[in-house]
Amino acid sequence: MAPSLPPELAALLAPFCVTHEGPGPNPFPAVSLEGVHALARRLEISPAKSMALCLEHDVWPLRFARNRGVFLAREQRRLLESRAAVIGCGGLGGHVVTLLARAGVGAFTLCDGDAFDESNLNRQILCREAVLGRNKALVARDELAAIAAHADVRVFPAAAGPGNLPEILHGASLVVDCLDSLAARRFVAAAADAAGIPFIHGAVAGDEGFAMLVRPGEKSLEALYPDRAPAFENTFDGGGAQLRAGVPTLTPAAIAVLQAGLALRVLTGKKTTGARLCHLDLAGPMLEVLAL
């Protein structure tokens, strides 16, 4: 047990702790979900705050133990205390939400006005036959409850637009763009810039896709999608490009991994480089990083 933990709390957690030999340089204590809940009840705090308190004393929740070595305890705690706004809960968004939840992000705002249909079954991880016809954001909320019951989740089962974006982005640490409309992306990017939070873009068509971090004040999205560009010729414009090239099973999953990776770097305070576009072509396969 971590020596800095108050004796009363150390005694409470002891029956629920195991010693892990790794990952990381030294053995460390890890506490089970049952222990997290016991501490939450004793202190009358939420399970998320219970896990954050454990991490403050370098006691790792067992559910995050394999993250150690990649994240420091303080970085894992930052994730628990962060809120990710995910706009679009389909092909990209379903993967992004589940990846961030498993990594440890503690709060989400989910926005999507669409319902699942049969054409989504080939690629959208949250789409199952049992949920056809249900709103995507509401299904994502239910999935989060099953993966990470401690997560605080706000849901907007409606399309994002200028009228509701300030409310959607309120309190968010960053926003992840999982949309398929260039016009909607521009609205969300402008709202993120106005709110002073990072915007993580993702787009897919065929075997190819983009992922990009846009920090407040940067104009990378405008550089990638200039107004003068023909909407259906040279850009990943969402609906147009997808109608031409299709959206197979693998591409959304791969681009969502890149988006989630960028989000985790931002949320944990790791060094990030803006004005860089990650272009993935699974037909190669090839990954290139381009300066904008």
Feature-to-residue mapping (PLM):
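N-terminal charged helix/coil linker that caps or initiates catalytic domains
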Residues: 2-84
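E1/E1-like adenylate-forming module used to activate ubiquitin-like modifiers
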Residues: 2-32, 155, 160-161, 166, ...
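Glycine-rich phosphate-binding loop and adjoining beta1-alpha1-beta2 segment
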Residues: 51-52, 110-147
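Glycine-rich adenosine-cofactor-binding loop
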Residues: 77-115
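Hydrophobic residues within alpha-helices
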Residues: 96-97, 140, 188
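Ligand-binding beta-strand-loop-alpha-helix segment within the catalytic cores
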Residues: 132-167, 183
